[in-house]
Swiss-Prot record:
Comp. bias regions, Low complexity: 1252-1266
UniProt region (Disordered), positions on chain: 116-143, 857-898, 930-1121, 1204-1227, 1243-1266, 1280-1343, 1434-1501
Pro residues: bias regions: 1045-1055
Span of domain Guanylate kinase-like: 1724-1907
Gene3D superfamilies referenced in this protein's UniProt entry, alphabetically: 2.30.42.10, Death Domain, Fas, P-loop containing nucleotide triphosphate hydrolases, SH3 Domains
Protein name, per record: Disks large homolog 5
TM regions (residue ranges): none
UniProt key word Phosphoprotein: yes
Organism of this sequence: Mus musculus
Oligomeric form and interacting partners: Interacts with MPP1. Interacts with CTNNB1 and with the third SH3 domain of SORBS3 to form a ternary complex. Interacts (via coiled-coil domain) with MARK3. Interacts (via PDZ domain 3) with STK3/MST2 and STK4/MST1. Interacts with SCRIB. Interacts with CTNB1. Interacts with SMO and (via PDZ4 or guanylate kinase-like domain) with KIF7.
Length: 1921
């Protein structure tokens, strides 16, 4: 920093640091200017407040470089009011506005004219604009000054007012003024004059100061400018010096080369003269020898010597040729250097222009700075300070002026030096031109020498060429003779074989003719039957509608009757309940008294034992004494202490406490057995020692009298080991609940007697305990005052005998494992010692059949509350004893009542107790699962399980203790219901299946609430049916189901969950099973949307057959874990009818029958309502690795996937983040690309039963089902030229590069189907590509042109997601940005020029260099990008070497596709990467270029919306135009509904029809759309009369098609053509006649030949469908007769996996019986007749790919024989990872690669482009599967296959130059087999086939074929409009 500036900054450092407020902004600007390093910035960030500003100034003072101007610029931008502090050292006051009172002068000038009070003058300068806030530095000074001025102003104002008053009195007369006049003080006058003078001086000083500041600022800016200019000129000077030195060196080098060339030319001239002399001598010698002696020996010697000399000359020639090629290469390099120098000159000129622009901007900034400095005027009241500051400024200005003069002198010197350098450069250029002219002369002389050498060489070779030609002819004749003999033998054999085949074929032809006659007869019969069926169908439909209405009315009446019946039953249940309560209480009392009397009769019973809690039984146990010395350990059991230490409090009996497994006592004694007598020794009131003594004293056998408790259904903890056998899922689900832990004796609950320990509490006072904690439940209990109503889930006994052995042993085992068995009663301990064990987290709600009718209002039960529990007395760990039911105990009649006494009311607060452990339950007859303790939830509150066998209910009304028990009642019909799972409330609504328990062998005993039927709505016509397979890979699938139409039937209504549900009586009507998919949300139920009324006539029989016959393949993979929201539109509901079921339902599963255990074990599909949430066992397919419902696996599209969706279901990209419903599950079970959706054909089959208006007989079109499966059954060979065509294979293909919008479904039609609005539903099917931008759309946040910006990208291992191309003059541009990639997120745009990449300059880099740099692995990337799309567009257009014919893409053929360049959408470079992407700008419509507008100044009317109510099939509107100019309304009939003031008028351009865009549709498409029956229409039209007048009467369509069949014209106007002919269609609705097109036949050069009439696509599709169906009729045995089933199913389906009702298939729709809603509208529907194509004229040479044997030899021969035409594609060696190479292939950088040892040989796109730009055919060395990848890159190679007859033929190939070695037998066989495999798999890609033979013959054929194909027009599949 300069000393003056350093001193100035040091003086104002403190004041500036205190006044600086926006420090962060200043730091940012300084860092951007380079004044602060990153380390200094971090150091500053650590400081805070004023310390940061002080540290900043200290750092700037400490720096050697001068950053004063950077600081000044930063302050000027952020805090301009601080600049005076910087220059005036803090003497300035606050900046004032120009209009405010900022000085004393201004204060005096605005004094009030009237007599204000002194208080109003206290605020000086308040009038006018308010001054800006003063800086902190001068605030005190300003305040003092203002106070002084205010005092003076008060005095002056008072005196002025006095003078004014006196003046007023004086003017009106002296008589009024009686007051004495006081003369003014002379001192005041003097002071006033001095003040005015001082103010004027101050004002002049201020003006001078302002001018000085302005001049200083200007000088500072000029100084900075000249500094920068000087540095740039110095750099340019050094660069020019380097260039001059380089040119000098090159000049010297060229001179040396010129000298060498001249010397070599002289040597060659001398050698030529010597050779001529020598040749003359030789000729003379030869003549002499011939004259003297004509012996042959001498001639041979002369010949040999001549040949030797010829060889020497040839070698010399080769050396000269090599030198000449080197010189040519050097010349080329010199030319490139010259071009680089020219570019450098242009760059310098651009820099000069930029400097001029910068100067202009500096002047503008200077003007702005002057304006900004006016705000910095401050109040300076002290004249001395102002004068001192002015002197300082003058001194500084002088310094700056001196610097300015120095800089100007330097500038003059620099200008002189630059002129000098320019002169030197001009001299170098002139010298260079001279050198180039001399070089041209040398080259011309060399050419002359070369011609002379060639003449000499031709003369020398003339003698040998004749000999070689003779030998070659002889060899060729020999080969021809051998081949002719071999071919003759083969031909004879083939003739014999063909003769036999001809005879057989003649016989087959006769039989086929006979069969055709029979088939014609059958067809006629079938058509007649079809007409009858159509009539019957219509009558049946009307009858079904009447029956449906009657059924609805009957069901509504039935529902009312059921409600009244439920009320009656409710009253009856209340009475019967009270009666049963009294009866049970009396029975219990009688049983208690009986037991009491029985126990009192025994003297051994202790009176302290509670006789009401249990029953006892006595048993005699006998042990065999094996030895005399025996103890308790040998017997295997242990006893309690008895009297001394009782096992139970208050009970002194001796109890068995332990029984060892496998011991003698095992099986005889049980834990808790009471030992009464051992060997006749009474143990009453005895201790353990006495018992042991009695045991050991016995001799022989040991007899023990044991009293044990009878089983009341207690729960036993039973260890159980389950072998999972490799499966991850045990099949057990858990759930929490609220249970009664204890009942306090004497409490109201104990007195009531119905509440027992272990009962689950479902609801308290009608409040369901779902998702409630234990504290909340207890607060509900405490809040009850007068009465309490509980809804309980009772635990009922399951066995009559209780096996309670080894309880304590099980407690010990439970420390290691926790398992459970299905539900047993709970055990109560003796004398009020309740053994409360862990209640199972899954209970079974078992009701007796008479109580099933009593339960009426059972709602959803919750299971999310905590367990109430009580630990086992005397045990450290709680247990859950439960018994495993036997198979014989599964009947309902085997249940016994739980007669537990001493039941009291009151739930014990167990918060202080140990938490209860939750158990997994879902076990089989003998199964439980082993669960480690460490995996059990210690809180026991959120296990997240389900209730697989329990269907609970909560009463919605106050029903007191609504669960009762009574043994052995009659059976009843169960109506299971489901409840939502409360433990897993998700964030979104999910689809979950109902409880499917068919995989459990244990009988499902389910009782739920019976809901009465409600009048069904139209939305109930389709339900879901849920089935599960028993396989381990079972999954849930949606199946459409319809309620039975056979009365009496109560279809499940859609009920509001807020409405109370009522019990329904058992009914004998058989109800069809369905399942409900519910939302697992916060207790809310998502509703299924209603269907249209027209969809109700899908009969239940057909749907049931769908459910029975269709099975999902077991090989289908699991679903994804994502689960779809339950928002299911009617479209998906309707289409789900066609989805195959996973598991096949048993016959019993179709209807309800009286309950039996066996029946329940066979099927577990309950009747569920669509609005009721369900809870069931979650099968393995429901784990997080799977999903359910209608979530369908979408096809995975890779680069090589080109599949057409015949039914139009579009695929979904994989990076899609949302799940959508799909109308088919076809893709669930496969990852192949067979996208033919079965749902579409099934749907059309069902829809065919609905009668609707159809087209006239001449316009009947094939149904969508026929269109769907005919692609594989029409026996038309499909051999398109290019595999990207739609019919390129038997499966079809779809080009991603050319068709960015997915095919639309033919079902997507606004007719009777609810699929008509896919864009308005929540399940709109996703598309392949993002919707393209409109014509004028541009991103608002796009960067400015020519504004470099830094882009930071956190890359990591992910690809960058961009494609790049090189510019014409260097540079790298972004040609594509992938949506969602890291580059897209970072802000890279299409058209960005990459200036730098991680600091590496890419401004002049080539594309290949940039790819290598960008491909480097790094975590963080910094890119300097500049948005400049225009240069890229010009470059890309100039490099484009092929174009589309405009007629092939008329009026936005590429509309909707984002491929192509921004300006010319029809330009396609076959070697450029043009893949559609969101970063690529949208293609502009070419309508503006093809449609001429007459008067541009005339305003076009705005589009309008027209609504038409369509009352008839024909709309009465005539159309004209087409996709070329648009479809216009030609005429509107008088009786048309479109007629009217708000209707259509002639000249209207149809823009939209409904929701469909008609701008690029053909007139036939619009006509077909208008024929479809609709109630109301919505059209968007625009009146364009002038265009209509031009279009009217002219063909308006324009597109190319490829014929896929042969046609012979029968009448004159028809057109004949052959398969693969290209036709140009110009009218799709000639003269308003539907069914034919007018087309031109084109030749190979796309020239029109003949125009004629051809059948339309719809007519041909109908014809093909009819032929297809007729060809399917076959006889299984003799083809003579058909079975009855075959006759019934005359028209058979194609797909074998579809539903078939009989062995031979079921009825298919008759081909002519279709409605208009099955007509496919769009062009992207698969057609077997025509294929839309577009023309590409390739101006550049296409690459050539050779396939077959001996490729290397053929390529080498082609390159050597025709070097100007062919060049092999070089393989680049890359040492990178496999992932990097594959990423390059994915990004279209590499075409193919081969793995070598340690590296990869890669074929790049850049190398192909480089060879093509040299005007040569590139011989590719890639695998056949990469052909499709080339097509994606718009590279269309010529694929030629070399076909040999056999491996022996390959082995026999010879060539003296290219194939010297013999091909081995093994090698030839391998090559032949490989060639055969390629021929089978990739024959559709072959452009031509060359028959194998001699290598020269093969090369000749290849040359001819390549020339022919290059001259042809290339036709590629066109994008659908």
């Amino acid at each position: 920093m300069e000393p003056q500036r350093r001193e100035l900054l040091a003086q104002c450092q403190q004041s500036l640091a205190q006044a600086m407020t926006e420090v962060e902004a200043v730091l940012g600007l300084l860092e951007a200017a380079g004044a602060l390093s990153p380390g200094e910035r971090r150091q500053l960030d650590e400081e805070a407040g004023g310390a940061k500003a002080e540290l900043l100034l200290q750092l700037l003072l400490a720096k050697e470089q001068d950053h004063f101007q950077d600081l000044r610029a930063a302050l000027e931008k952020t805090q301009p009011h601080l600049l005076p502090i910087l220059y005036l050292n803090g003497v300035v006051g606050p900046p004032q506005s120009t209009e405010g009172a900022g000085s004393t002068y201004s204060v005096l000038s605005i004094m009030p004219s009237d007599s204000e009070s002194s208080s109003s003058l206290s605020s000086v300068g308040t009038t006018g604009k308010a001054p800006s806030p003063p800086p902190l530095l001068t605030e005190q000074q300003a305040n003092d000054t203002v106070e002084n001025l205010s005092i003076q102003l008060r005095l002056m104002t008072r005196e002025r007012n006095e003078l004014r008053k006196r003046l007023a009195f004086a003017t009106h007369g002296a008589t009024f003024d009686k007051r004495p006049y006081h003369r003014l003080n002379p001192d005041y006058e003097r002071l006033k004059i001095q003040c005015v003078r001082a103010m004027s001086d101050l004002q002049s000083l201020q003006n001078q100061h302002t001018n000085a500041l302005k001049r200083c600022e200007e000088v500072a800016k000029e100084t900075d400018f000249y500094h920068t200019l000087h540095s740039r000129l110095l750099s340019d000077q050094t660069q020019l010096k380097d260039d001059v030195d380089m040119l000098r060196r090159e000049n010297g080098k060229l001179r040396r080369e010129r000298n060498l060339l001249q010397q070599s030319w002289e040597d060659m001239k001398r050698l030529r003269e010597e050779d001529q002399k020598e040749i003359g001598d030789l000729r003379a010698q030869q003549q002499q020898v011939l004259k003297h002696n004509g012996s042959s020996e001498i001639l041979n010697k002369l010949y040999d010597t001549a040949m030797d000399k010829l060889e020497v000359v040839k070698k010399d020639y080769d050396a000269l040729r090599k030198r000449y090629s080197e010189k040519v290469a050097m010349h080329n390099s010199d030319l490139s250097r010259l071009e680089q120098l020219g570019e450098e000159n242009q760059r310098l000129q651009k820099q000069t222009e930029m400097l001029t622009q910068q100067r202009d901007t500096a002047i503008q900034l200077q003007h702005q700075c002057a304006l900004s400095l006016r705000r910095f005027e401050t109040i300076h009241h002290e004249l001395s300070k102002a004068t001192a500051q002015n002197k300082d400024l003058q001194w500084e200005m002088e310094l700056l002026q001196s610097e300015l003069t120095e800089l100007r002198s330097k500038q003059v010197k620099t200008a002189k030096e630059s002129e000098k350098y320019k002169e030197e450069r001009d001299a170098v250029y002139s010298e260079y031109k001279l050198i180039m002219s001399e070089r041209d002369q040398v080259i011309s002389e060399l050419d002359k020498l070369q011609t002379e050498v060639e003449l000499a060489e031709s003369k020398l070779k003339s003698s040998t060429s004749e000999k070689k030609a003779a030998s070659e002819e002889m060899e060729a004749l020999r080969q021809i003779k051998d081949t002719v003999t071999m071919d003759a033998g083969r031909a004879n054999k083939e003739v014999e074989i063909l003769r036999k085949q001809c005879k057989a074929l003649c016989q087959e032809l006769k039989e086929a003719l006979q069969e055709a006659d029979v088939a014609k007869c059958r067809r006629d019969w079938a058509f007649q039957e079809r007409d009858k069926i159509v009539a019957e169908r219509d009558s049946i439909r009307t009858l079904c509608d009447n029956l449906r209405r009657e059924r609805d009315r009957a069901v509504s009446e039935l529902a009312e009757a059921l409600r009244s019946l439920d009320d009656t039953r409710k009253q009856k249940n209340d009475v019967s309940r009270e009666l049963k309560e009294l009866k049970e209480q009396m029975e219990c009392q009688l049983e208690k008294e009986a037991r009491f009397r029985q126990l009192m009769a025994h003297s051994s019973h202790d009176s302290a034992i509670d006789t009401d809690s249990m029953e006892w039984e006595t048993e005699v146990v006998e042990f065999e004494r094996e030895t005399e010395d025996i103890d308790l350990k040998a017997l295997g059991f242990d006893m309690a202490e008895g009297v001394n230490e009782p096992c139970f409090p208050g009970d002194c009996g001796i109890f068995v406490t332990k029984v060892d497994k496998g011991s003698i006592a095992d099986g005889r004694l049980r834990v808790n057995d009471w030992l009464l007598r051992i060997n006749d020794v009474d143990l009453i009131n005895k201790d353990k020692k006495q018992a042991i003594k009695a045991l050991l004293n016995g001799e022989g056998a040991i007899n023990m009298v044991v009293r044990r408790r009878k089983s009341l259904g207690g729960k036993v903890v039973t260890p159980l080991h389950i072998n999972l056998s490799g499966q991850k899922d045990s099949g057990i689900s858990l759930e929490n609940g609220v249970y009664a832990a204890a009942v306090v004796p004497g409490s109201p609950a104990a007195k009531e007697g119905s509440l027992a320990v272990g009962d689950r509490i479902v609801a308290i006072n009608g409040i369901a305990l779902d998702n409630k904690s234990l504290n909340e439940c207890e607060s509900l209990l405490r809040s009850c005052q007068d009465s309490l109503t509980l809804s309980l889930l009772k635990v009922f006994p399951q066995s009559s005998s209780w096996s309670g052995q080894n309880i304590f042993e099980n407690i010990k085992d439970s420390d290691r494992m926790l398992s459970c068995r299905a539900h047993g009663p709970e055990v109560q301990a003796h004398n009020k010692r309740n053994l409360l064990q862990h209640n199972n987290s899954t209970q079974t709600d078992i009701f007796y059949t008479d109580r099933l009718e009593d339960r009426k209002e059972l709602g959803h039960s919750g299971g999310s509350s905590s367990f109430l529990h009580k630990p086992f007395s005397g045990s450290s760990s709680p247990v859950s004893p439960q018994a495993c039911p036997s198979t014989s105990e599964r009947s309902l009649n085997s249940f016994r009542s739980d007669t537990s006494a001493e039941r009291g009311y009151g739930l014990v607060d167990m918060r202080s107790q140990r938490p209860l452990l939750s158990f997994e339950t879902e076990v089989g007859p003998c199964g439980a699962v082993e669960v480690p303790l460490d995996k059990i939830d210690p809180e026991g509150s959120n296990s997240g399980g389900t209730w697989p066998k329990a269907v609970l209910g909560s009463t919605s009304g106050p029903e007191k203790l609504s669960v009762y028990k009574k043994p052995k009642q009659r059976k009843s019909i169960f109506d299971p219901n489901t409840f939502k799972r409360p433990q897993t409330p998700p964030k979104i609504d999910y689809l979950l299946p109902g409880p499917g328990l068919t995989h459990s062998p244990q009988p499902s005993k389910r009782v739920g609430s019976l809901t009465p039927p409600k009048p069904p709505r139209r939305s109930d016509s389709i339900k879901f049916q849920h089935r599960l397979e028993t396989s381990s890979e079972s999954e849930a699938t949606l199946v459409g189901s319809s309620p039975s139409t056979s009365p009496p039937s109560a279809p499940p209504p859609s009920m509001d969950p807020s409405e109370p549900t009522h019990a329904s009586p058992p009914r004998k009507a058989r109800v069809r099973i369905a399942s409900s998919y519910h939302s697992e949300g916060d207790g809310d139920t998502s509703y299924l949307p209603a269907k249209k009324p027209c969809d109700e006539d899908l009969t239940s029989q057909k749907v049931d057959e769908l459910g029975q016959k269709r099975r999902r393949p077991k090989s289908a993979p699991s679903f994804r874990p994502k689960i779809s929201p339950v928002v299911i539109p009617a479209q998906c509901l309707e289409e789900q009818e066609c989805v195959p079921a996973i598991g096949e339902l048993s016959p019993e599963g179709q209807e309800w029958s009286p309950y039996s255990p066996g029946h329940a074990s066979r099927h577990g599909n309950p009747l569920l309502y669509p609005n009721r949430p369900s809870v069931g066992t979650v099968p393995r397919s429901m784990t997080p690795g799977t999903t359910v419902g209608s979530i369908l696996r979408n096809p995975i599209y890779t680069v090589r996937s080109h599949r057409v969706l015949p039914c139009g279901s579009p695929p979904v990209p994989r990076d899609a983040g949302s799940q959508s419903l799909s109308p088919s599950v076809q893709h669930q079970g496969r990852l192949s690309l067979d996208l033919s959706h079965r749902a579409c054909s099934d749907y059309s089959e069902m829809r065919a039963s609905q009668g609707s208006n159809s087209l006239p007989s001449s316009a009947r079109l094939g149904s969508s089902s026929n269109l769907q499966f005919k692609a594989e059954r029409i026996k038309i060979p499909l051999t398109p030229r290019y595999p990207r065509s739609v019919m390129g294979s038997d499966r079809g293909s779809l080009s991603h590069s050319e068709c960015s919008t997915p095919p639309r479904s033919p079902l997507n039609i606004d007719t009777l189907s609810s699929c008509s609005q896919p864009q308005t539903t929540a399940s709109t099917l996703p598309r392949i590509a993002v919707n393209p931008s409109s014509h004028g759309e541009r991103r608002k946040d796009r960067p400015f042109v020519e504004e470099p910006r830094h882009v930071k990208v956190q890359k990591g291992s992910e690809p960058l997601g961009i494609s790049i191309v090189s510019g014409e003059k260097g540079g790298v541009y972004v040609s594509k940005v992938t949506l969602g990639s890291i580059a897209h997120q970072a802000g890279l745009e299409y058209g960005d020029q990459l200036l730098e990449f991680n600091g590496i300059n890419l401004r002049s880099a080539t594309e290949q260099q940039a790819r290598l740099i960008i491909g480097q692995q790094c975590d963080t990337i910094t890119i300097l990008a500049q948005y400049n799309p225009h240069i890229h567009q010009l470059n890309s257009h100039s490099r484009s070497s092929s174009h589309l014919d405009p007629a092939a893409t008329p009026h936005s053929t590429l509309q909707g596709s984002s491929a192509g360049t921004p300006e010319h959408p029809s330009v396609i470079d076959p070697l450029m990467e043009q893949d559609e992407g969101p970063g690529t700008p949208p293609a502009k419509q070419s309508a503006s270029s093809t449609r001429s507008v007459g008067d541009t100044t005339k305003k076009t009317p705005d589009p309008r919306i027209v609504f038409i109510k369509k009352s008839q099939l024909d709309l009465g509107v005539h159309l004209c135009g087409g996709n070329l100019h648009g479809v216009f309304v030609a005429e509107v009939e008088d009786d048309s509904p479109a007629k009217g003031p708000d209707g259509l008028v002639p000249g209207d351009l149809i823009l939209e029809y409904g929701s469909l865009d008609m701008r690029s549709r053909t007139v036939e498409d619009v006509y077909v759309e208008m024929l479809k029956p609709k109630d109301s229409l919505r059209l968007k039209v625009q009146y364009r009369h002038e265009e209509f007048t031009r279009v009217k009467g002219l063909p308006g369509d324009s597109f190319y098609i490829r014929a896929l069949y042969d046609r012979l014209a029968e009448v004159e106007p028809e057109l004949s053509f052959k398969k693969d002919d290209i036709l140009y269609v110009d009218d799709t609705l000639p003269q308003g006649v539907f069914g034919s097109w007018m087309a031109w036949q084109l030749d190979e050069n796309a020239q029109k030949i003949q125009r004629g009439q051809i059948p339309s696509k719809y007519v041909m599709d109908q014809e093909f469908s009819r032929r297809l169906s007729m060809s399917e009729v076959k006889d299984d045995n003799t083809a003579k007769t058909l079975s009855a089933a075959a006759r019934r199913s005359f028209f058979r389906r194609k797909h074998k996996h579809k539903r078939s009702g009989s062995k031979d298939g079921k009825d298919l729709l008759a081909l002519d019986t279709f409605s208009n809603d099955s007509i496919p509208l769009f062009e992207d529907s698969v057609s077997l007749a025509y294929q839309r194509v577009q023309k590409v004229d390739c101006t550049s040479l296409r690459p050539v790919l050779l396939l077959g044997p001996l490729l290397d030899v053929v390529k080498e021969m082609l390159v050597n024989e025709a070097p100007g035409k062919f060049c092999r594609c070089p393989l680049e060696v890359m040492k990178a990872s496999q992932q990097a190479i594959e990423r390059g292939v994915k990004d279209c950088l590499f075409v193919d690669y081969k793995r070598r040892s340690g590296h990869f040989d890669v074929t790049t796109v850049a190398s192909i482009k480089e060879i093509t730009e040299k005007n040569r055919h590139c011989l590719l060395d890639i695998a056949p599967h990469a052909i499709e990848r080339l097509h994606h890159m718009h590279i269309y190679p010529i694929v030629i296959f070399i076909r040999y007859k056999s491996a022996k033929h390959i082995k026999e190939q010879r060539d003296p130059v290219y194939l010297r070695d013999k091909v081995t037998q093994r090698h030839s066989k391998e090559q032949f087999e490989t060639a055969q495999k390629i021929d089978q798999e990739y024959s559709r890609y072959f452009t031509g086939v060359v028959q194998g033979g001699a290598l020269s013959s093969i090369c000749t054929q290849i040359l001819a074929m390549v020339s022919q194909e290059q001259s042809k027009v290339l036709w590629i599949p066109a994008c659908p409009p």
